[in-house]
Amino acid sequence: MEFENKEVVNRPLVSVIIPIYNVGTTIYRMIECLEQQTFQMFELILVNDGSTDESEEICKTIIRNHQNYYLYSKENQGAFSARNLGIEKANGAYLTFLDADDKIDSNYLEILFHNCMGTDIAVCDVAVYKEDTEISRFTGGNQKITQTQALNKLLVRKEINSGPCGKMFSQKIIEEVRFPFLRVYEDILFVLECFCKVREITVTDKTTYYYMQEDTGTMGRMAKSPSVDIIAATEKIMDFIADRRDLSEECTYITISHLYQYALPVAIQNNYRGCEFILKTQILYRKYMEQILKCKAMPWKEKVIFYLYAHGYVYTNKFIKKIQR
């Protein structure tokens, strides 16, 4: 179902895409940020992903007051599906993705737009906030970097965040790219594919995207009960790394270690009894054990820990415990 407040007469320079799912009144914070933008030659595409609260009615009210705002509604499938629909509906020469409950600087669209024009992808700072306190920041200064440099920064999770937010993409390079059918970690796979379509990427610290971290959000829920989609995404990333000899070995180390940050707590919570997530993680570690053991960036102690886990043992608190099937 579609709710549009006007026909598209002139093509906007930028399409802003926001997936909506049970965000309630928190959407007003991001709408206020967009109203305050120094760059106003954009369209806003809101995609309601089957919200069960008042989100759709709130969005209908919002678009009535803005000629360049549009609302599309669909059944619930996840953020990946909502963003893909947004891409299909976008009319802008450039696209950027926002989340409804985050914030951006007033010069966000202007800075990203001008930096994106020369390289087709622009990346800015992303500040992670929890309870009004900045707890971390991805920042790469002001520079143009090669595709290989950008992929390294993305995969080692330094300077460039893994999500689609804090970035702008030209429509021509995103034309055939879509978010994969995953509930989580679909974002890093999307960004990875986009980065592979350009030779250079512009990085700027002249504007910031503010990620408002909540324990009740997707990542908070995922830490407590991780989805096997994380394993599927890790497998795709490991295959990608294996095919790219130009990438840093640290990419392997960080990718494997990141999965273990989910796997170890699951094993402890399950009292060292096997479950689907544990068993599939073990299979993945066994599949890539040669890469793990050959990785020069990985400390030998962690190689031993991953080897033990792959064969049914967990090292924790200086003890080795067997995972029961």
Map each language-model feature to its residues:
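Short beta-strand/loop segment that forms part of the nucleotide-sugar
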Residues: 42-50, 70-75, 100
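Short aromatic/hydrophobic "clamp" motif used to bind/position activated sugar donors
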Residues: 95
